[in-house]
């Protein structure tokens, strides 16, 4: 067959498209993936028929599906569909714009060649689904003034050339094409007063008046035609005008030009509606964004942009030499990478800013650009000739997620993790051994070495926990010195009070965290006996609700203990009407139980309680459970840590209403929930000085999202300042966007880049032992620290300490006397709209 890679990828696209056709044929409304796959696949087939042109196929593609054939969210998710195929005259790009213009599509065309039955249009009826608009922006009504309080002038400009001339917003106007004739003296130190990145076009022979404003910042002109190089002052103005005359640049004096200050004189003032501003640069202060297809709205609390001086990359845009990009700054004085105009959602706030990256670290969040011509540029956020740009307009940025409950059962889970937005994995294991399938322990020093070596080139941060189950502390030292950054106590190894005390004693000695899965059997005692064994020492309790394991039925009480850092795992996030039914078989497999042994079945059933799972929802919403993690392949889904966190937040908003009285946004709830998978697991595990938030000095582990896909599918994952994974189309295509668009590894994930931009977390003892050199690790190796004196009060926005009781017979949970109960959700967001299976 001699199939090329692009042909193999198109076969995957065809499989998805044919699956979509089968679903359409049985009367199902298609989701985002199905819709794109079907349209792209049919275009490929029509091209193969050889009878249609590109233009004809662009029209046909719009006819295939109507609004009734797709889920209500789909028209807001699919902007266009692009695919490249082999026509009679070679490979060509087909782009389908303006989809879903009609109520119904041409289903005969949509199913042409599939030999599937064409369903009646009567099957596609409207129902009472929630018609949320994914990623919608709600703007305030007032307009914004661009370039406010600046000197401005109106000048008459004539194009005396025979070709059109287009001038960008930040081009120094005195430097423009010599065939534009105007008063260049009055234009000295000025630029167009238009939206950043826009341009004004002068057709041949055209005369028009333009408004110019003074440049900002240090007022230094660089670049262009080198007419007026240097600071704006009288001496340089005279030299510039001499060059204008000498070099034959068009110049005519305009004596009565109108001058004034923007914002004071309406004729000199440029305004823009908030809707148009949001379309160009993303929402600004006071505007709101819907997160995915949830009912959560994030309101921008602060925007660092200077209206009119936004940094925008592209042809004729702002970030060009002497304009948004400074001239003459050496590499050490400028950013390596800037993410422009991004909405940042972090526990610290919801802001709009540029993000500066240098040497793999976040340098700052604020205003980036060229301080020679722009106001309020941060001194450490200069864009220079050595700066790469990632356009963040219209995107949301979060810190890379931290999953601190990972069973390392197979290496493939790493790729599901990173493509979902996780950049740090903490847990234990050795592969699909039965011990790892049940517990997050890497027991032997040689196995610790194996895990650190095997993950060395993977583009994530890793930390591995040793087995902590030993009543005699002498056995625990070696695994810590071998590289364990924490210890795990698990009931499958015997989490007795003696083992707990021994493990915590050793952890105190080495300043490492202890993660505990308590005794479901109540074999050595009840939950109060385990709490007593803690002796007030810091401990991180895994799946604190209990379905994942722990004292039955009341392990959830630990969420009210000051020395306990509670987390829960995602299979019970949130409580839905199918949650209970899936859990029994899940548990039997994970913990090596036998369905033919009654005691094994009783053990499993004792852990699955609707009442405590429902209470878990509410305790998360109250901030009493501080962390959400996966429990990967051991009763949890590593690729759904983020989505299930936001599903829980959405469910709680719908059932409990606003968290703060009178709020007209969901900012507090959003910050509380994002903290559960970013900063709080970082703090709990001693990593927060390196990762866990979008703050200066931390590793640039960042996740970029389209608002409409927030929480479901990231657009890009940046690891240590470099793009590690991103949505990327056909690698052979003329542009990067034709189907199949897949979350693919990028250069930041290959070769030595995967290790050079990531960290292996170990104990200080292991670092001092020299494990980096002795194991031959390429990754940066850092020691965890500052975990032994942590309390619940250190958990950001999730530090509530309720008094919790659980009725041992009815399993009713109360917190400070309030019965915690909620109904199971029948539907959740971030699900059917986005995923093929």
UniProtKB/Swiss-Prot annotation:
Residues with the N6-carboxylysine modification: 488
Database matches in InterPro entries: Amidohydro-rel, Metal-dep_hydrolase_composite, Metal_Hydrolase, Urease, Urease_alpha_N_dom, Urease_alpha_subunit, Urease_AS, Urease_asu
Reaction catalysis annotation: urea + 2 H2O + H(+) = hydrogencarbonate + 2 NH4(+)
Taxonomic source organism: Glycine max
PTM per Swiss-Prot/TrEMBL: Carboxylation allows a single lysine to coordinate two nickel ions.
EC number assigned by the record: 3.5.1.5
Binding-site residues for substrate, renumbered to this chain: 490
UniProt miscellaneous comment: Plants with decreased expression of EU4 exhibit increased susceptibility to the fungal pathogen Phakopsora pachyrhizi.
UniProt-listed SUPFAM superfamilies: Composite domain of metallo-dependent hydrolases (SSF51338), Metallo-dependent hydrolases (SSF51556), Urease, beta-subunit (SSF51278), Urease, gamma-subunit (SSF54111)
Main function: Catalyzes the conversion of urea to ammonia and carbon dioxide, thus allowing organisms to use exogenous and internally generated urea as a nitrogen source. May be involved in plant defense to pathogenic fungi.
Induction text: Induced by the fungal pathogen Phakopsora pachyrhizi 1 hour after pathogen inoculation, followed by a strong down-regulation at 24 hours and another up-regulation peak at 192 hours.
Cellular component, GO annotation: urease complex
Cofactor: Ni(2+)
Record text on subunit structure and interactions: Homohexamer. Other oligomeric forms may exist depending on pH and presence of salts.
Active site: 591 (proton donor)
GO biological process terms held by the UniProt record: urea catabolic process
Transmembrane parts of this sequence: none
Stated name of the protein: Urease
């Amino acid at each position: 067959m001699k199939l090329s890679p692009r042909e193999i990828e198109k076969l995957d696209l065809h499989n998805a498209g044919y699956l979509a056709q089968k679903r359409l044929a049985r009367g199902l409304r298609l989701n985002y993936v199905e819709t794109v796959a079907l349209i792209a696949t049919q275009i490929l087939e029509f091209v193969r028929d050889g009878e249609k042109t590109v233009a004809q196929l662009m029209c046909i593609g719009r006819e295939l599906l109507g609004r009734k054939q797709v889920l209500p969210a789909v028209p807001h998710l699919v902007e266009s569909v692009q695919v490249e195929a082999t026509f009679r005259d070679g490979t060509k790009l087909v782009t389908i714009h303006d989809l879903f213009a009609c109520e119904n599509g041409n289903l005969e065309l949509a199913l042409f060649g599939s030999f599937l039955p064409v369903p009646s249009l009567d099957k596609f009826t409207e129902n009472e689904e929630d018609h949320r608009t994914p990623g919608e922006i709600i703007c305030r009504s007032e307009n914004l003034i661009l370039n406010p309080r600046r000197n401005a002038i109106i000048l008459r400009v004539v194009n005396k050339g025979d070709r059109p001339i287009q001038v960008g917003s930040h081009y120094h106007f005195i430097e423009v094409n010599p065939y534009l004739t105007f008063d260049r003296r009055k234009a000295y130190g000025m630029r167009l007063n238009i939206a950043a990145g826009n341009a004004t076009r002068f057709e041949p022979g055209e005369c028009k008046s333009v408004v110019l404003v003074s440049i900002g910042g240090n007022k230094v002109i660089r670049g262009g035609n080198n007419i007026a190089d240097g600071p704006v002052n009288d001496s340089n103005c005279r030299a510039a005008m001499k060059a204008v005359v000498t070099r034959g640049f068009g110049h005519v004096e305009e004596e009565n030009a109108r001058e004034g200050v923007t914002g004071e004189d309406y004729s000199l003032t440029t305004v823009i509606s908030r809707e148009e501003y949001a379309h160009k640069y993303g929402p600004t202060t006071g505007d709101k964004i819907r997160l995915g297809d949830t009912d959560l709205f994030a309101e921008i609390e602060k925007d660092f942009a200077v209206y009119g001086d936004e940094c925008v990359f592209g042809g004729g845009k702002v970030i060009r030499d002497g304009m948004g990009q400074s001239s003459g700054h050496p590499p050490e004085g400028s950013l390596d990478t800037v993410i422009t105009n991004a909405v940042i959602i972090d526990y610290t706030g919801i802001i709009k800013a540029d993000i500066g990256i240098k040497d793999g670290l976040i340098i700052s969040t604020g205003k980036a650009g060229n301080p020679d011509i722009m106001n309020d540029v941060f001194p450490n956020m200069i864009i220079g000739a050595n700066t790469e740009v990632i356009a963040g307009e219209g995107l949301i940025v979060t810190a890379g997620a931290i999953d601190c409950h990972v069973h390392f059962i197979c290496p493939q889970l790493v790729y599901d993790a990173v493509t979902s937005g996780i950049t740090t994995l903490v847990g234990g294991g050795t592969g699909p051994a039965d011990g790892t399938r049940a517990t997050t322990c890497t027991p032997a020093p040689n196995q610790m070495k194996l895990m650190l070596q095997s993950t060395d080139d993977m583009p994530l941060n890793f930390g591995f926990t040793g087995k902590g189950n030993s009543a005699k502390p002498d056995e625990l030292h070696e695994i810590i010195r071998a590289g364990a950054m924490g210890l795990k106590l698990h009931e499958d190894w015997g989490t007795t009070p003696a083992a707990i005390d021994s493990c915590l004693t050793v952890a105190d000695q080495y300043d490492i965290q202890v993660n505990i899965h308590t005794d479901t059997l109540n074999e050595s005692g009840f939950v109060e006996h385990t709490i007593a064994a803690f002796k007030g020492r810091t401990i991180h309790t895994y799946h604190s609700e209990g379905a994942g394991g722990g004292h039955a039925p009341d392990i959830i009480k630990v969420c009210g203990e000051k020395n306990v850092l509670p987390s829960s795992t995602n299979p019970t996030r949130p409580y839905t009407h199918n949650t209970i039914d899936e859990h029994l078989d899940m548990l039997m497999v994970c913990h090596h139980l036998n369905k033919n042994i009654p005691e094994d079945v009783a053990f499993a059933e004792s852990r699955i309680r609707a009442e405590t799972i429902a209470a878990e929802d509410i305790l998360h919403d109250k901030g009493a459970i501080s962390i959400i993690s996966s429990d990967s392949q051991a009763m949890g889904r590593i690729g759904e840590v983020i989505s299930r966190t936001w599903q829980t937040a959405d469910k709680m908003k719908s059932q409990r209403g606003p968290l703060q009285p009178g709020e007209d946004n969901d900012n507090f709830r959003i910050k509380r929930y994002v903290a559960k998978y970013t900063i709080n697991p970082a703090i709990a595990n001693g990593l927060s000085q390196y990762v866990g938030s979008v703050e200066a000095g931390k590793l640039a582990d960042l996740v970029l999202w389209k608002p409409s896909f927030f929480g479901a599918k990231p657009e890009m994952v940046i690891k240590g300042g470099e793009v590690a994974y991103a949505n990327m189309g056909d690698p052979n295509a003329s542009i990067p966007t034709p189907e199949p668009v897949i979350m693919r590894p990028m250069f930041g994930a290959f070769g030595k880049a995967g290790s050079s931009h990531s960290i292996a977390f170990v104990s200080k003892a292991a670092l001092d032992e020299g494990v980096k050199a002795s194991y031959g690790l390429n990754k940066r190796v850092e020691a965890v620290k500052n975990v032994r004196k942590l309390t619940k009060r250190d958990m950001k926005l999730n530090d509530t300490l309720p008094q919790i009781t659980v009725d041992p017979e009815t399993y009713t949970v109360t917190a400070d006397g309030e019965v915690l109960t909620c109904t199971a959700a029948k539907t959740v967001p971030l699900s059917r709209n986005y995923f093929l299976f």
